[in-house]
């Protein structure tokens, strides 16, 4: 009798396990999508909470340009999210940067490709460009705002010293909302 019970269990176990694996995979994809949505919201708010110095734009009508190094799908999602919105009266212009030299023409750059961090930071050194990346090591490398996960939440850390070195002014809202403020 016990053998029959085990055989019946084995009959539903494999399909149930397959269903659980499929649901978990969908949950992982959903988590990644929701993390991208939060990243988009963070980037939009970073643009609002930083002050750029006079002369940061080529003209009074120039757009607010956001460059993405790596993560083209995130760039597309950001472009859709900010369509019809502006920051400081300026429309958004979204660019995928294949060459890091294009970063100097942006007001904000998101580095989604770890191998490019040093090159982008060198290209924008001393220029009024907000540089956002991922992971705590990003700040240690000279980045300005680093996104990272804390459990299921996406959080950010701020390096105000790097921000002010770029002649930008971090707003109080930015530093208060950060998980931590490092480097000055």
Residue ranges of model-derived segments:
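Short hydrophobic alpha-helices and adjacent helix-cap/hinge residues
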Residues: 2-19, 26-184
């Amino acid at each position: 009798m016990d053998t029959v019970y085990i055989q019946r269990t084995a009959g539903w176990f494999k399909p149930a396990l397959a269903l659980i694996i499929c649901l978990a995979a969908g949950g992982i994809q959903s988590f990644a999508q929701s993390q991208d949505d939060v990243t988009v919201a963070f980037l939009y708010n970073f643009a609002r909470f930083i002050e750029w110095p006079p002369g940061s734009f080529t003209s009074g009508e120039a757009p607010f340009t956001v460059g993405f190094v790596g993560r083209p799908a995130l760039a597309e999602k950001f472009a859709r999210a900010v369509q019809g919105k502006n920051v400081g009266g300026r429309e958004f212009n979204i660019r995928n940067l294949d060459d890091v030299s294009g970063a100097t023409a942006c007001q904000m750059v998101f580095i989604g490709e770890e191998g490019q961090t040093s090159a982008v930071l060198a290209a924008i050194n001393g220029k009024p460009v907000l540089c956002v990346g991922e992971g705590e090591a990003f700040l240690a490398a000279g980045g300005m705002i680093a996104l990272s996960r804390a459990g299921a939440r996406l959080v950010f850390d701020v390096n105000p010293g790097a921000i002010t070195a770029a002649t930008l002014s971090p707003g109080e809202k930015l530093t208060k909302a950060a998980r931590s403020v490092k480097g000055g």
